[in-house]
Amino acid sequence: TLIYACLKLGAVIVVADTGLGLKGLTRALKGANPQFIVGIPAALAAARSLLWPGQRISAEPLNAFQERLLGVSGSVFAVAQKNQTGTVDFPAPAPGADAAVLYTSGSTGPAKGVVYTQRQLAGMRDAIAHTYGFEEGSALVAGFAPFALLGPALGATSVTPKMDVT
């Protein structure tokens, strides 16, 4: 849900996962210089100790002690609780606007950030919808990580088994 909210806002998401290792994650995040890092407590602990840039926000509710320990300024949960009263309309991002930075595996050298535009992500979504006949209300059980992310974007009711996507 957070990824889709960021894309709708026009925020550029940077996806770097643990498969890069601490050295690779540090290189990726320092290179991307994000304004915010949203993560689970283990990722936030790494962000604090490795001096990753960006304001730290927890993906899980934390108590006050945990927030201070991790240097967290809030949680996604707290923001969602504050804004339950209504919706906010944002202008749609331009099709050519940057949407995401996804990192290569690093199997042939250091992982590299690949920038995708709003148009490219929409094109991938539309190609999969057309190829597999997805429409709003379709059902999807995703065993392949990219399809797990695309399911909700396709309007499909999605179930994703617990899996390690790295």
Enumerate the language-model features and the residues they cover.
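Conserved ATP-dependent adenylate/AMP-binding module captured primarily in the ANL superfamily
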Residues: 3, 14, 18-49, 122-141
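Conserved AMP-binding/adenylation subdomain of ANL enzymes
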Residues: 11-12, 122-139, 145-166
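Motif I (Walker A/P-loop) of helicase-class P-loop NTPases
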Residues: 2, 117
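Conserved pre-ATP/AMP-binding loop-to-beta segment of ANL
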Residues: 80-103, 110, 120, 133-139
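Short, acidic/turn-prone active-site loops that include or flank metal/cofactor-
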Residues: 12, 18-21, 59-65, 163-166
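Hydrophobic/aromatic ligand-binding patch that stacks against planar heteroaromatic rings
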Residues: 5, 28, 148-151
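ANL superfamily adenylate-forming
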Residues: 36, 42-95
